[in-house]
Regions:
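Cytosolic catalytic regions of ATP/NTP-dependent phosphoryl-transfer enzymes
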Residues: 190-196, 313-476, 483, 496-497, ...
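Helix-interface capping motifs at the ends of transmembrane segments in multi-pass membrane proteins
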Residues: 61-81, 241-279, 292, 296-302, ...
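Hydrophobic alpha-helical transmembrane segments
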Residues: 73, 77, 81-112, 119, ...
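Acidic, divalent-metal-coordinating active-site segment for phosphoryl/phosphodiester hydrolysis
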Residues: 492-494, 500, 512-523, 560-568, ...
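Membrane-embedded transport module
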Residues: 253, 284, 527-578, 592-762, ...
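Non-lumenal N-terminal regulatory segments of integral membrane proteins
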Residues: 1-132, 137-145, 150-158, 162-169, ...
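Soluble-to-membrane junctions at the N-terminal ends of transmembrane alpha-helices
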Residues: 34-68, 101, 122-124, 181-190, ...
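Basic, amphipathic juxtamembrane/active-site segments
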Residues: 158, 165, 175, 330-350, ...
Length: 830
C-alpha cells in the first residue's frame, strides 16, 4: 500500500482505525497476529542460539573433523576421546554463557521505551514493542519514532532522518498527501521507524511495524551489527596474532611428521590437538561471563548496561564530557527572581513567563517546572491560538494567546536569542546600542554569579489564521527570569576520585561562558581554558584537535558542535565518554567511544546510550569505570596466563615430536590436559583484582601481549626441556611413562603458575578469587592421581613411581619461583 498517497479517511478505513485509535482489545488481537514491533536480531538469544555459537568455533569444528577421520580409519578410542572433549568444552561454555546472557537480558528489560498511544480514545504510555498498525501515537521533541506512520496533525514538527536517508538536517513533517512516486526523502507526510523527533509535536497513524517498515526492509537485506568497540578491535587483533602463530606451528609439525613417515591419521590428530592446545578455546565463554558479571555488579551500583561490549570501553575512558545540569549541579532548578528590563523585580515578567511555560508543549524543561512552582498562572479565559516550539537553533519558544480582538505573542528563551528579535524595551522604548549594552551588563552580572538567565519578550499583533517563526520579530523586551541550580553535594570529591582514576572532566554546555566558569570553579574543575561555540566555528579541524585537548569548558555550543568536539578528542587518541540526556545530545553520544545517559532522559538519548544511570552523579560513573577496568583486566589476565603457558607447552611438544622416536603426548592427552587446565580459568572471571589495576585507563596492546606470550612461553619451554632431560637422562623412562610424567608435570605447572601470573604483586600478597582458588586446589591432587584412576588406560596414562612424582613436584615448585622472578623482571622493564 502506498500509504503516503492515501487520504487520512482512506487510511482509517483500510486500517480499521479512527481519530481515537484502536480499542485495547483490538490492539491486543493485532499484537497476537502480527507479533511484537521488533526488527530481526533484536530478540535475546535462545538456548539453541547459544549452543550453536559454541559449535561455530573453527577449532571445535576442526576437532570434530579430526574425530571423524579417526573413526573412519578405525581409531575409535581416539575418536571417542576427542568427541568427549568437544562435548565437555561446549557444555561448560554453553552453561556459563547462557546464564550470562539471561542475566544481561534481565537487566536490559528494565529499560523499556514507551510511547503515548491512544487506546479507546484515551492517551497512555505503551511499550514500543506493543504498538500495532492502526494505533494513533503522539510524538514530541526527543521521542523515538516507534513505527512507520502518517502525520495526522503537527506543530513545527521536525524529524531527524539521518539514520534512514543520510540527510543531516532535520526534515519538516506536515499532514497531507504526496505523490505516489515520491521517494523516501520526499514523503513529508510520513515518519519512519529508526528516526527521532528534533522539535515540535505531532499526532500520527501507525501504518506498518517491525520488519514491514522501511527500516525493517533494510535490516532484511543487511546484517546489522553494532559499531566495533575498541575492545572488539583488540580481540580481533589478538585473534590474528594467535592464528598466525598457530598456523605456522601446525604446518611445520605436519610437514615434519609426514617427512619422517608418521601415520597420516596420527599426524592429523596430533597437529589438530596442537592447534587446539595453543588456543584459549574458552575465551568466548570467559568474555560472556566477565561482561555479564560486570553488568550485574554495575546494576547493583546504579548503572544499567545496554551494550555489554561497551563495558571495557568505559574502563578505558580517559576523558568524560558532560553538561553541568544534574551532573555537576543538583539538577533541582529554582526560580531566583523575575526582573524588568531595568533589573527591578517585576510581577509582569513572571506572569508572562508563567503563561509561556504553562502553555508550551514538547519536552518538559526544569526551568519551566521552576516557573510553575513559583507562579501557577490562572488560565481561565486564556485561549491559546498557536505555538512556535523550542528548537536548538532559535533557543526560544513563543506562544500565541487571544487578547481581545488581537493576539499576544510571548517569547521566552536564551537571553541573546530573545534579544535578537527585539526592537524595543518595555514599556515602549526603542532599543539602541546603549540600551542593548545595559541589558548585556545586567545579564553578565547574573551569569558571573552562576545564575542562569532567560529573557522574556512580547508583542501584540492582529488576529490571523496561523503563526510561524516569521512572526518572531519587532518584539518588546520585557525582562529577565533568573534561576539557581546549586552544585551537587560531593561532586568535588567525585571529580577528584575520577582524576585519581586518570579520567579528566570536560564541560560541554549550551549555557553561557560565565555561568559555566562560575560553576566549574565551585567544584574544583579547571576553568582557565574556555572555548565558546562562536570561537569553535572559526577553527578548522586540525586546530580544533589541538585546542580541544587543552580546553576545560566548551560553552554556548550547539548539538553539531558537541559532536565535533568529541571527534576532535578521539582524533588525538583519547577514549572519550559522553554523558547526555537531551535530544540535542544524541549525535555526540553516537560519536563517543562510550555513551551514558540517565533514566529520566528523553527516549532518543536513552536509546543512544551504552549505559543508563539510575541516579545522577559522577560517583555512580566512578563505580562503573572501576568495574569496566576489572572486567577488562580479568579478561586480559585469562589471555596472558593461558596463551603463554599453552605456547610454551606446544612449542616444547612440537620440537620434541620431531626428534623423539615417539609422540611426547598423544592427541587425546593434549586435549585432556588443555581441558583440565582451562577449568579453573573459568574462575578468573570472578577473580579478585589488585587495587592498582583499576587506577589507570587500560587499553589493548598487542605488542605487550605478544611479548608476554613469548617471554613466559620461553620460560615454560625451558622447564619442559628440563623435565625431558630428567625423564630420559636420569629416570630412563619408557614412552608411556614419559607421556604420563610430562602430562602430570604440564598440568600441574599450568595450575599453580596461574596463581602466580594472575597478579603483578608477589603471589603471596594477592588473594585469588574463591572459585579460582578452590578449583585449583581440587585439581592439583587430581593431577597427581590421574595415572592411577580407572579410566587412565583409555588416555594412555600409566602408574608412576613415587620418586618420579616427587621430582615432578620439585620441578613445579622451582617453576613457580622462576616465574615469580621472571614476572618481577618483565614488569620492571615494561
Amino acid at each position: 500500500m502506498q500509504y503516503w498517497a492515501e487520504t487520512v479517511e482512506s487510511l482509517y478505513r483500510q486500517l480499521g482505525s479512527g481519530p481515537g485509535g484502536l480499542t485495547a482489545e483490538e490492539a491486543a488481537r493485532r499484537l497476537r497476529e502480527s507479533g511484537p514491533n521488533e526488527l530481526r536480531g533484536s530478540r535475546p538469544l535462545s538456548r539453541l542460539d547459544v549452543a550453536s555459537r559454541q559449535l561455530r568455533s573453527p577449532l571445535l569444528l576442526l576437532l570434530i573433523f579430526a574425530a571423524l577421520a579417526s573413526a573412519l580409519s578405525g581409531e575409535f578410542v581416539d575418536a571417542t576421546i576427542v568427541v568427549a572433549i568437544v562435548i565437555a568444552t561446549v557444555g561448560i561454555g554453553y552453561s556459563r554463557e547462557y546464564s550470562a546472557q539471561r542475566a544481561a537480558a534481565a537487566l536490559r528489560a528494565q529499560l523499556h521505551v514507551r510511547t503515548t498511544v491512544l487506546r479507546d480514545g484515551v492517551p497512555g504510555p505503551v511499550p514500543i514493542e506493543d504498538i500495532v498498525s492502526g494505533d494513533v501515537v503522539r510524538l514530541g521533541a526527543g521521542s523515538l519514532v516507534p513505527a512507520d506512520a502518517v502525520v495526522l496533525a503537527a506543530t513545527d514538527f521536525y524529524v531527524s532522518e539521518a539514520a534512514l536517508t543520510g540527510e543531516s538536517f532535520p526534515t519538516s513533517k506536515l499532514p497531507g498527501v504526496v505523490d505516489a512516486a515520491a521517494g523516501l526523502a520526499e514523503r513529508t507526510n510520513c515518519v519512519f521507524l529508526g528516526t527521532n523527533v528534533r522539535s515540535g509535536t505531532a499526532t500520527c497513524l501507525v501504518v506498518t511495524t517491525g520488519g514491514a517498515t522501511e527500516f525493517g526492509s533494510i535490516a532484511k537485506r543487511l546484517t546489522l551489527r553494532p559499531p566495533e568497540t575498541e575492545f572488539d578491535r583488540g580481540i580481533r587483533r589478538f585473534g590474528y596474532l594467535l592464528t598466525t602463530a598457530m598456523l605456522v606451528m601446525v604446518l611445520l609439525v605436519f610437514v615434519g611428521h609426514m617427512f619422517r613417515g608418521r601415520p597420516p591419521v596420527e599426524t592429523l590428530l596430533f597437529s589438530v590437538a596442537l592447534a587446539v592446545g595453543l588456543s584459549p578455546e574458552l575465551l568466548p565463554a570467559i568474555l560472556s561471563i566477565n561482561l555479564a558479571r560486570g553488568a550485574q555488579v554495575m546494576a547493583r551500583h546504579g548503572v544499567l548496561v545496554r551494550r555489554l561490549n561497551a563495558i571495557e570501553n568505559l574502563g578505558s575512558m580517559d576523558i568524560l564530557c558532560t553538561d553541568k545540569t544534574g551532573t555537576i549541579t543538583e539538577g533541582v532548578v529554582q526560580l531566583e527572581g523575575a526582573y524588568d528590563a531595568q533589573g527591578q523585580p517585576s510581577d509582569r515578567t513572571l506572569e508572562l513567563g508563567a503563561w509561556n511555560a504553562a502553555l508550551e508543549t514538547g519536552i518538559s524543561s526544569p526551568l519551566d517546572d521552576a516557573i510553575g512552582q513559583a507562579r501557577m498562572p490562572d488560565l481561565a479565559g486564556i485561549t491559546k491560538l498557536g505555538e512556535m516550539p523550542f528548537d536548538f537553533m532559535r533557543k526560544r519558544i513563543t506562544v500565541a494567546l487571544k487578547e481581545g480582538d488581537g493576539v499576544r505573542l510571548i517569547s521566552k528563551g536564551a537571553f541573546h536569542h530573545v534579544l535578537e528579535i527585539c526592537t524595543q524595551m518595555a514599556p515602549a522604548v526603542p532599543l539602541d546600542d546603549r540600551l542593548r549594552a545595559a541589558l548585556e551588563t545586567l545579564y553578565e552580572a547574573w551569569a558571573a554569579r552562576g545564575i542562569r538567565v532567560l529573557a522574556v519578550a512580547t508583542r501584540t499583533i492582529v488576529m490571523q489564521d496561523s503563526f510561524s517563526r516569521e512572526d518572531e520579530r519587532e518584539m518588546t523586551f520585557t525582562g529577565f527570569l533568573t534561576f539557581i541550580d546549586r552544585p551537587r553535594e560531593g561532586v568535588a570529591r567525585a571529580i577528584s576520585d575520577l582524576a585519581n582514576l586518570g579520567v579528566s572532566i570536560k564541560l560541554i554546555t549550551g549555557d553561557s561562558r560565565l555561568v559555566a566558569q562560575h560553576v566549574a570553579s565551585l567544584v574544583g574543575l579547571g576553568a582557565d581554558h574556555v572555548l565558546t561555540g562562536r570561537q569553535l566555528d572559526e577553527l578548522h579541524d586540525e586546530a580544533l584537535w589541538r585546542e580541544a585537548e587543552r580546553t576545560d569548558i566548551f560553552a554556548e555550543v550547539d548539538p553539531n558542535q558537541k559532536e565535533r568536539i568529541i571527534l576532535a578528542l578521539k582524533k588525538m587518541g583519547h577514549v572519550v565518554g559522553f554523558l547526555g540526556d537531551g535530544v540535542n545530545d544524541a549525535p555526540a553520544m553516537h560519536a563517543a567511544d562510550t555513551s551514558l545517559s540517565v533514566q529520566q532522559a528523553v527516549d532518543v538519548a536513552r536509546e543512544a546510550a551504552d549505559f543508563v544511570l539510575l541516579e545522577r552523579g559522577l560517583h555512580v560513573i566512578k563505580r562503573g569505570i572501576e568495574e569496566g577496568r576489572r572486567t577488562f583486566a580479568n579478561t586480559l589476565k585469562y589471555i596472558l596466563i593461558t596463551t603463554s603457558a599453552n605456547l610454551g607447552n606446544m612449542v616444547s611438544m612440537a620440537v620434541a615430536s620431531l626428534f623423539l622416536p615417539f609422540l611426547p603426548l598423544t592427541a587425546g592427552q593434549i586435549l585432556l590436559n588443555n581441558f583440565l587446565s582451562d577449568v579453573p580459568a573459568v574462575g578468573i572471571a570472578d577473580d579478585n583484582l589488585d587495587d592498582e589495576m583499576v587506577k589507570r585507563p587500560r587499553r589493548w596492546d598487542i605488542r605487550f601481549i605478544g611479548r608476554y606470550m613469548v617471554e613466559f612461553g620461553i620460560l615454560s619451554t625451558a622447564f619442559d626441556f628440563l623435565t625431558f632431560g630428567l625423564l630420559l637422562g636420569i629416570f630412563h623412562v619408557a614412552p608411556d611413562a614419559f607421556r604420563t610424567s610430562w602430562f602430570v608435570e604440564s598440568l600441574l605447572t599450568e595450575l599453580v603458575v596461574a596463581l602466580v601470573m594472575r597478579t603483578r604483586r608477589p603471589f603471596y600478597r594477592s588473594r585469588p578469587g574463591r572459585l579460582l582458588l578452590y578449583s585449583t586446589g581440587v585439581l592439583i591432587p587430581i593431577a597427581f592421581a590421574m595415572p592411577y584412576l580407572p579410566f587412565a588406560p583409555v588416555f594412555g596414562l600409566v602408574p608412576l613411581p613415587a620418586s618420579l612424582l616427587v621430582a615432578i613436584a620439585g620441578i613445579a615448585m622451582l617453576y613457580v619461583l622462576a616465574t615469580e622472578l621472571q614476572k618481577v623482571w618483565f614488569y620492571r622493564h615494561d
